[in-house]
Swiss-Prot record:
Pfam families: SOR_SNZ. It comes from Natronomonas pharaonis (strain ATCC 35678 / DSM 2160 / CIP 103997 / JCM 8858 / NBRC 14720 / NCIMB 2260 / Gabara). InterPro entries: Aldolase_TIM (IPR013785), PdxS/SNZ (IPR001852), PdxS/SNZ_N (IPR033755), RibuloseP-bd_barrel (IPR011060). Its EC number is 4.3.3.6. Keywords: Lyase, Pyridoxal phosphate, Schiff base. GO terms for molecular function: pyridoxal 5'-phosphate synthase (glutamine hydrolysing) activity. Catalyzes the formation of pyridoxal 5'-phosphate from ribose 5-phosphate (RBP), glyceraldehyde 3-phosphate (G3P) and ammonia. The ammonia is provided by the PdxT subunit. Can also use ribulose 5-phosphate and dihydroxyacetone phosphate as substrates, resulting from enzyme-catalyzed isomerization of RBP and G3P, respectively. This is Pyridoxal 5'-phosphate synthase subunit PdxS. The gene is pdxS. In the presence of PdxT, forms a dodecamer of heterodimers.
Length: 301
């Protein structure tokens, strides 16, 4: 076997990484801190869980530096559930991502929810076997992350607020740009790529597909079944829910309701019944009241 073949086996290929991400399509991925929360999430119907030290709402309250969670906690969650387990690394923090991969994370989120480690560069995700998910506010950001090796994109939204406004804004930004690209000729797409700092090959691929070349989930401020249904109606492939589950009055009921809403997002009668079931949601904070320095979505390039 040649050295090239061995190298290909050692690292997950783009095809394998994107294939794993596609397996989560149509599902809900829930943030968890403990193995007990992971069990609740799996029982509620989550397709995967995201392990972190604290949910985003608590990270906001606590302040200070937010880092990768203790890998021992990640191991506990992996032992507890049968669904995929993801972990968060700081933007640009290659060593944290290496630790998460070595611990057994099925996917790594290079996340703006944690304190940014590098102001200029993101992790080179092509050097990892584990697939990555990254946040984006617009199509240029999304395509730059995909070029670095991301297998999944999510809206950044404004995590920990319970306000879906920014997730909606980011998804509409991405969809609007894709529609615009699809109506351009080849030279115009090249010009768009230069203006937005996006890889031209990915720009052309996106225009021809009429969507991102990888799965695109909603995240950031999704707090209710109705929020989840809205994001699916806007063309998302699935949903990340952070503080909205375990910040709710009844996490099990809220988790089940969000999963049901994603499965029935285009059926208002069923959504009406689902919306009655989960009890009181998390206490939110409107995005427009946040000071600029507290907005997590601005982290990254």
């Amino acid at each position: 076997m040649s050295n090239t073949d061995l190298e290909e086996l050692r690292r997950g290929t783009d095809l394998v990484k994107r294939g794993f991400a596609k397996m989560q399509k149509g599902g809900v991925i829930m943030d968890v801190v403990t193995r007990e929360q992971a069990r609740i999430a799996e029982d509620a119907g989550a397709v995967a869980v995201m392990h972190l030290e604290s949910v985003p709402a608590d990270i906001r309250k606590r302040g200070g530096v937010a880092r990768m969670a203790d890998p021992g906690g990640l191991e506990d969650v992996i032992d507890e559930v049968s669904i995929p387990v993801m972990g968060k690394a700081r933007i640009g923090h290659t060593a944290e991502a290496q630790i998460l991969e070595a611990t057994g994370a099925d996917m790594i989120d290079e996340s703006e929810v944690l304190t940014q480690a590098d102001d200029r560069y993101h992790i080179d995700k092509r050097e990892f076997t584990a697939p990555f998910v990254c946040g984006a506010r617009n199509l240029g950001e999304a395509l730059r992350r995909i070029d670095e090796g991301a297998a999944m994109i999510r809206t950044k939204g404004e995590a920990g607020t319970g306000d879906v406004n920014q997730a909606v804004t980011h998804q509409r930004n991405i969809q609007r740009s894709i529609r615009k690209l699809s109506g351009m000729d080849y030279e115009e797409r090249d010009e768009w790529a230069r203006e937005h700092g996006a890889p031209r090959e990915l720009v052309h691929e996106t225009a021809e597909m009429g969507r991102l070349p990888v799965v695109n989930f909603a995240a950031g401020g999704i707090a209710t079944p109705a929020d989840a249904a809205l994001m699916m109606q806007l063309g998302c492939d699935g949903i990340f829910v952070g503080s909205g589950i375990f910040g709710a009055e009844n996490p099990q009921a809220m988790g089940e309701a969000v999963v049901a809403a994603v499965n029935n997002y285009d059926d208002p009668e069923t959504l009406k019944e689902i919306a009655k079931s989960p009890g009181k949601g998390m206490k939110g904070q409107a995005n427009e009241t946040l000071p600029e320095e507290e907005k997590l979505q601005d982290r990254g390039i």
